[in-house]
Amino acid sequence: VWENARDWLRYDLLDSVMNYDFRRHCRDFFALGRIDAAGFADRVTNMVLRYPEPYLRAQLNLLDSHDVCRFLSLCGGDERRMRLAVVFQMLFPGAPCVFYGDEAGLTGVTEPEYRRPMDWENAEGSWFDFYRQVAGLRAKYLNGTERFTVLAAAPQSRLFGYALEREGLCLTVWLNAGDAPCPLPEAEEAERLWEQNASHEALG
């Protein structure tokens, strides 16, 4: 199901679908820059509210599949943009789906390219380590019952912030999809769990 799957997600039909809307929104914000943070927040919030909670948690959230060009290619080879999308994929309600080769940095625009065999020589390089780190955050802190709330998504801004909350946990995520560093909002009693391209004052 390539579009809104609400009509299919019923007890007598399907329990989950491949969430191509998730990929589409990530493509337009992180990879292509077609929408600003406010537009991304609107799309993602609509996606969250569209499905009953049990179905939302079961959505197969993908960035790549055998039917679409590789996300890293959509990013023009910009690894930073791809990594932002992967962080969002791993730290968002649903089931993150990693298409083979993404953890090795595979690229491809045409069908023979994005379906080419796995690059085993580079299977455990920097991309593999990155996926392992972000997946480790998900495994350590999330259990699938968290509520998703947008914290920051201003018009014409490329800084997107959100929270995942449940009893005993408030995990905030800040993603700067712009080219310039962004100041981080001050947070009292907040522990930094993991960061990339960030200082104590700004997010690069």
Predicted regions and their residues:
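Generic recognition of flexible, low-complexity loop/linker segments
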Residues: 47-49, 85-87, 149, 159-162
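Carbohydrate-interacting/catalytic domains
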Residues: 42, 77-79, 93-98, 102-204
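Active-site clefts of carbohydrate-active enzymes
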Residues: 53-77
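Active-site-proximal helices and loops of the catalytic beta/alpha 8
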Residues: 1-53, 88, 107-133, 165, ...
